[in-house]
Amino acid sequence: MTGEGYKQAIVVRRDLGMGRGKAAAQAAHASCEAVFLILESGRPEWRRWLEMWRLQGQAKVVLRVESLAELQEVYSKAVEEGLPASFVRDAGKTQLEPGTPTAAAVGPAPSRLVDRITGGLKLF
């Protein structure tokens, strides 16, 4: 589609009370994991989306949810829609217990598809 935009939405749990640096690190983990998933997937469509996203400047938006249930819902919807998505659990080395779900990423993918899942969320 000509002129189509691509982006990645990163969703971070606010209910955990993570410090700014911790939240930023979790967002980065989610972003990177989604890209690694695409590179390892062998799915040509996802690879094309990744390349277009890269060429367009790697647009990202960081959004918030207030609960684990909301985070799981975002991730599940992305997977159901066939979009690349990651789900991050903390290693437990600093502020959180090991295995605590902290963040997810949807995309990179066409913005219109990402927005179907994350369009109602607020900025982090």
Swiss-Prot record:
It catalyses: an N-acyl-L-alpha-aminoacyl-tRNA + H2O = an N-acyl-L-amino acid + a tRNA + H(+). SUPFAM superfamilies: Peptidyl-tRNA hydrolase II (SSF102462). It holds the Pfam family PTH2. GO terms for biological process: translation. Coiled coil: none annotated. Gene3D superfamilies: Bit1. Its EC number is 3.1.1.29. GO terms for molecular function: peptidyl-tRNA hydrolase activity. Keywords: Cytoplasm, Hydrolase. It is found in: Cytoplasm. One of its GO terms (cellular component) is cytosol. It is an enzyme of class 3 (hydrolase). The natural substrate for this enzyme may be peptidyl-tRNAs which drop off the ribosome during protein synthesis. Belongs to the PTH2 family. This is Peptidyl-tRNA hydrolase. It comes from Aeropyrum pernix (strain ATCC 700893 / DSM 11879 / JCM 9820 / NBRC 100138 / K1).
